[in-house]
Amino acid sequence: ALTAEVSRGRRVIDASGLYVLPGIIDPHTHLGLAVPFGQELESETRSAILGGVTTIGTYFNQPGSYLPVIDRLRREVSQLSRVDMIPHSALREQQQIDELPLYSRQGMNSFKVYMCGVPGLYPHQEDGFIIRLMQRMKQLPPTAHPILSIHCENTSICDYATEDMQSQPLDTLADWNRTHPNLAEGEAVRRAAYFAREMGVRTYVVHSSTREAMEALAADKHPNLYVETTSPYLCLDTDSPIGAYGKMLPPIREPESRKALWDGIRSGLIDTIGTDNTVLTAGEKQVSSGMREAGAGYPTLGTHLVSVLDEGIYRQELPIEKLVPLMTMNPARIFGVYPRKGTILPGSDADLVLVDLRAARTVDPRPLLS
């Protein structure tokens, strides 16, 4: 409780003229895809904390049961992470659905499926699998607040589009965009929204990237449906001069889609801003091999907050009060860690970020420690 007596800290920071924000929550990261989880956990959470991100949601992925690895993952997070973590588990097999109650008892209540997979990493799941998973989630205790993240792209459309591009030039971000068309995301978002409504399961649409997705969500937004976009989609488009460094899944989109995402933030359609952080070194990215062979994804934790504030405040002319809840309070509420996280209240964790909106700096990757 607040009292008249406040003890003096060991260090006093003069925050005059600065914004004091709750620690930023990035609900969407991937760690341990190319190297062991513990190795990336140490480097990327170090970069996160330097960028003002104090809590991350990380999507774990493996075949078979998660039960044998939960204790190891918990131990690695405790020993190596500089930030707190919200665990999400990607599900791909019936055994994992059967074990949901056991995962829930271990504190894993956030799950994920891919309507369109990532070759070599994540298989796609058929609609029947998703419905069966939702049915099982409804049997979990309501106090667990289970939630299902869905990667929304129509896998058949993406497969055909990718096949068509095999005989076409694939040199630019616009070319890469054509392998995963906007249509594929718009259609899949409509399905996910319908499933969430009919099944009564809290559903989180990850990394929304297109105008078509915004139109679909605006037509069927309901209390069980939450919408995420990411800082790369808000700050970059197919006209950005970054070449294969910008290769992602889903792709960075055309300027019209980027505008639609900012309109979604203005209207309140979008609930959260994450990163979809994926760690690749320059060598692993293989940019020199061209767009077709380059790896998808790149690390963004260290520049996430400053990118959103720079673009949102100075180019989109939005107040900071409009942006901060999408990176603090909203993800905290959605993933069940509010009010411990996402706000500055008596009893909340003292995760604080000081922001100087007057400072101008050029991004240098060396201090980011990723």
PLM segments and residue spans:
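Histidine-rich, glycine-flanked metal-binding segment
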Residues: 1-21
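Histidine-centered catalytic micro-motifs
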Residues: 23-34, 148-152, 208, 275
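His/Asp/Glu-enriched, well-ordered alpha-helical/loop segment
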Residues: 171-191, 195-200, 245, 267, ...
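Divalent metal-coordination and catalytic microenvironments
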Residues: 17, 28, 48, 52, ...
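Alpha-helical scaffold segments that flank or form the walls of functional sites
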Residues: 18, 35-87, 92-109, 128-142, ...
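A conserved acidic, glycine/proline-rich C-terminal tail/linker
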Residues: 364-370
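Gly-rich Lys/Arg/Thr-decorated short loops/hinges at beta-loop-alpha junctions or inter-strand turns
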Residues: 25-29, 50-58, 166-177
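Histidine/acidic residue-rich metal-binding segments in metalloenzymes
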Residues: 95-273
